[in-house]
Amino acid sequence: MAGSSTNKDVVLHFLTDVFVNHDMTRLDEYLRDDYIQHNPDCPQGKAGFVKFFDVIFRAMPDFRYHVREVVADGDMVMAWVTTQGTHTGSEFLGQAAGGNPVKFDAVDIFRMQDGLIAEHWDVADTFTFFSQLGIVQGAEDRQRKE
């Protein structure tokens, strides 16, 4: 289980550096050169990762992950996180900054190889996220109109 503990530590440091401190300068310490991203909205590789999150960080300068739980088993690591931020920066998904606060949960799953993140999958509550940004109508708004 020592490998699982080490893998868990790598993921925790990665999440803190990237999603709390917005530091993309150390990605070589966390991501393999052939890193595979399974989120269809995020381009492949390190450069795609940086591009994707640069847009989010510019739109929500206070974007942060709160790590709720991390579980490791062999080469797999799962993190349950709450994402929080405020759309006060640049345009995002066609929406001008409106000061909308966002808060939603996500689960990130990482496959580790040789101490680095080789693959990533995620499941995020994008309906809540997009509703809070005003991109889609939230369930509460629909019920009020009916």
Predicted regions mapped to residue ranges:
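C-terminal and inter-domain tail/linker signature
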Residues: 1-146
